Regions:
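Bacterial Sec-dependent N-terminal signal peptides
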Residues: 14-34, 101-108, 112-118, 201, ...
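Solvent-exposed, low-complexity, repeat-rich "mucin-like" stalks and linkers
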Residues: 19-22, 29-58, 120-147
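Propeptide-to-catalytic entry region of secreted or membrane-anchored zinc metalloproteases
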Residues: 210-327, 503-542
């Protein structure tokens, strides 16, 4: 027995001595003095190295992902991946540290700067009679790699009008004989002769012949009741318009737009079958001007233009007009502001606090009359913004390549929304048993909807998941998916009947009121397929009744 113990101790001693004799070292199998990644998200390089001891790898840069991050002695392939696009003008660097038993070897990784076109301004206005204008920009592309073209035949680019040295595009706008303004986009694309990549765009708005100012404000703040609720508490929706002249109110244009907006809001399930729960109002807003370039409009709306679909407005003015309605509950109100413009844009704001610092359901959705009153894009974007974001507080389900992996700060922000019962259509786990829509994954009644766990949402490519490949909260071209329909249904019952619902209650309702799977193709030249939509904004400010 003593001999066995002595033998065991001898083996331990020899083993300990052997480990001490092995010094930590790294042997890199290729040149690492210059490790460069392309500017695109998910750009990757792999380096091979051998370590004589256990090792770990780390970096303090959020944009660089390392895999694997540790290992035992041996030869490894270390993948270095850019989690997001470098859309700045300058390259960026990260330090990767290989660590083993007190030894640290550092590697410098550089991500190249993206090709860019930077505009002096993103929106230009021109008068109805037409004329010339200059679009100024800077770029790091050579002349043969950059193409510039317009989406409208009324905007022409004379031969030899582009100045290479000065980065100026000279344009001519033909006269606009219509009363309404019209919009065109100028696209700046990188080309390799076969494919084009959109880098930036300019929005050009030409005024119509009816550009003037209002003189009669007598109908301002007039309230029109469009619908009284026949079920529940009567959830308030308030419609109002920005950029409408007194003459457009007098001739019935304003009321026509408000009526159409109301009908559009109830074109998708489940709100289509829950319409009786809503009180709907229209408040007349007389704007001094029908232009959004700094002239006075009732709500001071401005559109960012260019690559952005962002709309900003004066929410205090919107709230003032809401409170023209007698006995309305401001904190339960969905306000929809329709802009008197054909531009493709839309933005929603929520996260307003009451006097007790409690978050409320108040939301303000801004949406132009996209293209025209009967255009499908107007309906789709209005439903996406006002119903999806404004009423149900759903998240966006689309993603952009340049955004890469969702950062921890964004995850925290979305989880905060979920603590209020919002953002029920996205999650951060792939666990079928715990994901927010796990019940649908196990329900054979929803097999035809292909509900699953699809990576990419909240504008980010990875680290966040959505329920379906496409939906109203993705491309806007089809209805709400089942988890979103449930979120909307639950919201109506919670606020309209002061009660919680069960999964089975919803499925019974849902099957009795099936959602039509509408799919509409879009013109390839449409700006909607290439321009980023602004995410909803959590305002985080107090408002008082």
């Amino acid at each position: 027995m003593k001999q066995s113990i002595l033998l065991f101790l001898l083996i331990l001693l020899i083993s300990g001595c052997s480990e001490k004799e092995i010094d930590p070292s790294f042997s890199l199998q290729e040149e690492t003095s210059s490790i460069t990644l392309a500017s695109a998200a998910n750009s990757q390089t792999v380096i091979s190295f051998t370590s004589t001891r256990e090792w770990g790898a780390n970096t303090s840069s959020e944009w660089l992902l390392i895999s694997p991050t540790s290992g035992k002695a041996g030869t490894y392939q270390l993948a270095l991946t850019a989690s997001s696009k470098n859309d700045s003008k300058d390259s960026r660097t990260a330090i990767v540290n290989l660590v083993s038993a007190g030894l640290t070897q550092s590697l410098t990784v550089t991500q190249s700067a993206a090709d860019y076109v930077e505009l002096e301004q993103t929106t230009y206005y021109t008068e109805a009679q037409g004329g010339s204008l200059q679009v100024k920009f800077t770029t790091n592309l050579s002349g043969d790699k950059l193409v510039i073209y317009s989406t409208a035949n009324w905007l022409t680019q004379p031969a030899d009008s582009r100045t290479e040295q000065g980065y100026v595009v000279n344009l001519t706008a033909l006269p606009n004989e219509d009363e309404r303004e019209r919009t065109a986009n100028l696209y700046f694309c990188k080309t390799n002769g076969l494919e084009e990549e959109l880098l930036n765009s300019v929005t050009i708005i030409q005024e119509g012949t009816n550009t003037s100012t209002s003189t009669d404000y007598s109908t301002d703040k007039t309230v029109r009741i469009l619908q009284r609720a026949t079920e529940g508490n009567g959830l308030p929706i308030v419609l109002m318009g920005d950029g409408f002249l007194d003459t457009e109110i007098e001739d019935g244009t304003y009321d026509e737009v408000m009526n159409k907006a109301m009908e559009n809001l109830f074109t998708e399930e489940p709100l289509k079958s829950l319409r009786n729960y809503f009180n709907i109002y229209s408040v007349t807003a007389v704007s001094r001007s029908n232009r959004f370039d700094g002239y006075n409009t009732a709500f001071g709306c401005q559109m960012a233009g260019g690559m952005s679909t962002l709309i900003t407005g004066n929410d205090e003015n919107v709230i003032d007009y809401i409170q023209c309605i007698e006995n309305i509950d401001l904190y339960e109100t969905l306000a929809v502001v329709v802009l008197n413009s054909p531009s493709y844009a839309g933005t929603t704001y929520f996260g307003y606090y009451n006097e007790n610092n409690q978050v409320t359901e108040l939301a303000i959705a801004y949406c132009p009359i996209i293209y025209d009153l009967e255009n499908e894009s107007f309906r789709q974007v209005l439903v996406h913004e006002a119903v999806g974001h404004g009423f149900a507080k759903l998240e966006d389900e689309y993603s952009y390549e340049e955004n890469g992996k969702i950062p921890s700060s964004e995850i925290s922000s979305v989880k905060m929304l979920q603590s209020y019962g919002w953002a029920q259509n996205v999650d951060f786990t792939q666990d079928e048993n715990t994901i927010l829509w796990s019940s649908f994954l196990k329900d054979s009644r929803y097999t035809s909807e292909s509900i699953g766990i699809y990576e990419g949402a909240c504008t980010y490519m990875s680290g966040v998941y959505r329920p379906t490949e496409d939906s109203m909260m993705n491309t806007n071209t089809c209805g709400f998916n089942a988890p979103s329909r449930k979120a909307i249904y639950d919201m109506v019952m919670k606020r309209g009947e002061n009660r919680e619902t069960s999964y089975e209650e919803f499925t019974v309702f849902d099957k009795q009121n099936p959602s039509e799977s509408q799919t509409f193709s879009r013109n390839s030249a449409s700006t909607s397929s290439s321009r980023q939509f602004a995410r909803p904004h959590f305002v985080g400010k107090s408002v008082h009744k």
